Amino acid sequence: MAVPKIVLFYVFTPLADPEAIRLWQYTLAEANNLTGRILVSEHGINATVGGDIRDVKRYVKGTRSYAPFKDADIKWSDGLGDDFPRLSVKVRPEIVTFGAPGELKVDADGVVGGGTHLAPDEVHRLVEGRGDDVVFFDGRNGFEAEIGRFRDAVVPDVSTTREFVHELDSGKYDHLKDKAVVTYCTGGVRCEVLSSLMRSRGFGEVYQLDGGIVRYGEAFGDTGLWEGSLYVFDKRMSIEFSDQAKTLGRCSTCGGPTSRYENMPDDRGRELVLVCADCTENRAG
């Protein structure tokens, strides 16, 4: 019986021949019947793929056989079996698109000049010790935060990751430069870059949630500082860490509580829109 699984991971490390890595990763993933998206650049690899658990395990073992990827933090979750339409493996200037590849510096230990990594329990200790001096800073697209975010987090007004550089340069967050800023995102990759961009712009004390929201949810579920659902970039659209998750999202049609996204352009040109099950049924009827 097939057991569908999804794995998410990234590694920042210098890659002399990204195209060779792309070909190897495509061959490895295809041979194991996986679908999903893998991005490769001179800075490393960023992958989200899914398939049957036995195939995924073989892929993970093969990926870790390459020395620079041997310590990759693999995040596992349950899939649906048809979570991605196809397998896509591409070389790009960046493995997460901030539009600032020239600013990123990477060595064998990862991103140079990034924020200090904090495990979930270390984040709690920081908040307990520093209180209001600690600010959570969302490193995701704005729509993702509509259904879930850390309590009292700063959520930048961005619709794509490319807009973060302009946001940081706008000055609207300069009042946070003397705060303890904890950046967070889904699995950690965006905050690797975001935290380095913030530090280079004068933010004095920048941290990043190690392993992202995924690892935090595994550790604390809905009993900690996280509230709501987590948006994910596959057919599932969102996941919860427990049956106690709050519903923060609001239906774009009736205003009722929902965490359901649909691909449906609204009057602001957005394709992903929050629509509750009742409104979906009424529209279909």
UniProtKB/Swiss-Prot annotation:
It catalyses: uridine(34) in tRNA + AH2 + O2 = 5-hydroxyuridine(34) in tRNA + A + H2O. The active site is at C185. GO terms for biological process: tRNA modification. Its EC number is 1.14.-.-. Residues 130-225 form the Rhodanese domain. Keywords: Oxidoreductase, tRNA processing. It is an enzyme of class 1 (oxidoreductase). One of its GO terms (molecular function) is oxidoreductase activity, acting on paired donors, with incorporation or reduction of molecular oxygen. SUPFAM superfamilies: Rhodanese/Cell cycle control phosphatase (SSF52821). Gene3D superfamilies: 3.30.70.100, Rhodanese-like domain (3.40.250.10). The keyword Oxidoreductase applies. It holds the Pfam family Rhodanese_C. Belongs to the TrhO family. Catalyzes oxygen-dependent 5-hydroxyuridine (ho5U) modification at position 34 in tRNAs. HAMAP family: TrhO. This is tRNA uridine(34) hydroxylase. The lineage of its organism: Bacteria, Bacillati, Actinomycetota, Actinomycetes, Mycobacteriales.
